[in-house]
Amino acid sequence: MSTIYDHAGSLRRMGNDPELFHEMVELLRTDAPTLLSAVQSADREGDPPRLQRAAHTLKGLSANFGAERAVAAAGEVERLAKARQSGGLPAAITELEESLDELIAALAPSPQMSGSS
């Protein structure tokens, strides 16, 4: 089983700056739900360019963490939107939702990190 994200690789990509890492985690936590909502509404409204842009942004956010499953899922949504192949979108969007939920949960601070007693 592969890991959900690559912590060491993420830190390297962020200049070994733990503060930047935590800022990027917060960015993902705040932006991913908004972008996922944009993916869902663009799909419902039949707006492939908007769907493609939102999926592309989610792919980039996920790539910051080396989250292969989320990157692949966002890439598939982006590819389907670009090709205007709506038939595979429901399953691809579900996979994207699940992989982002998994990533965000994996990035949640542990009790030791949060400073709780």
PLM regions: where:
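Two-component system phosphorelay core
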Residues: 1-117
